[in-house]
Amino acid sequence: MTDILTNIFTILSRMSLAEGFGFNTDIFETNILNLAVVLGILLTSGREFFVSLLQNRQQNILQSINDADERYKEAAEKLQQAQNEFEQAKLEADQILAQSKKTASEIEVGLMNLIKEDTKKLLDMKQATISFEEEKAISEIRRQVIRLALQRALEQSKSRLNRRLQKRVTRLNIGLLGRLVTPNDV
């Protein structure tokens, strides 16, 4: 700024006083003079206006920077919180997956045990049914054999024995039958 004023005074001092006021056709010289005058007026009269304008602009810029920093900090906090929540959700998902695998394994073992038990019960029931049917068939065959034997014995005893001998043989056969036939067979 002092350079400008120095230049103005240098130019004014080089001018002769006799020339006075007039029309200067040198564009470069007149522009410098005009600029110097305008700047001088602006610096003296509008200094407070420009200072307050620059201060307001500086405050607005600083406020914008502070707001941007605050928004950045909030965004960083939200990002960190979201990352923490994501990690927590990931851990919970891993735990749920591990628990479901464990539960599935336990259910599989339980089902296999139930299948084994049911198979064993079915085999036992099958064997019991077979044994029961065998006993039933044997019992039926015994009855038929005994009945046929009795019929034959009676027929033979009628033809060969007298009454007294028939009674004795009959009692003996009844006694033998009583021992052979159990209460379940009747």
Swiss-Prot record:
Domain of life per record: Eukaryota
Name of one Pfam family that matches: ATP-synt_B
Location in or out of the cell: Plastid, Chloroplast thylakoid membrane
Lineage: Eukaryota, Viridiplantae, Streptophyta, Mesostigmatophyceae, Mesostigmatales
Subunit-level organization: F-type ATPases have 2 components, F(1) - the catalytic core - and F(0) - the membrane proton channel. F(1) has five subunits: alpha(3), beta(3), gamma(1), delta(1), epsilon(1). F(0) has four main subunits: a(1), b(1), b'(1) and c(10-14). The alpha and beta chains form an alternating ring which encloses part of the gamma chain. F(1) is attached to F(0) by a central stalk formed by the gamma and epsilon chains, while a peripheral stalk is formed by the delta, b and b' chains.
Membrane topology annotation: Single-pass membrane protein
GO cellular component: chloroplast thylakoid membrane; proton-transporting ATP synthase complex
UniProt entry keywords in alphabetical sequence: ATP synthesis, ATP-binding, CF(0), Chloroplast, Hydrogen ion transport, Ion transport, Membrane, Nucleotide-binding, Plastid, Thylakoid, Transmembrane, Transmembrane helix, Transport
A GO molecular-function descriptor: ATP binding
Family named by the database record: Belongs to the ATPase B chain family.
Miscellaneous notes: In plastids the F-type ATPase is also known as CF(1)CF(0).
Descriptive protein name: ATP synthase subunit b, chloroplastic
Function statement: F(1)F(0) ATP synthase produces ATP from ADP in the presence of a proton or sodium gradient. F-type ATPases consist of two structural domains, F(1) containing the extramembraneous catalytic core and F(0) containing the membrane proton channel, linked together by a central stalk and a peripheral stalk. During catalysis, ATP synthesis in the catalytic domain of F(1) is coupled via a rotary mechanism of the central stalk subunits to proton translocation.
Organism: Mesostigma viride
Annotated TM spans: 27-43
Keyword Transcription (UniProt): no
Main location: plastid
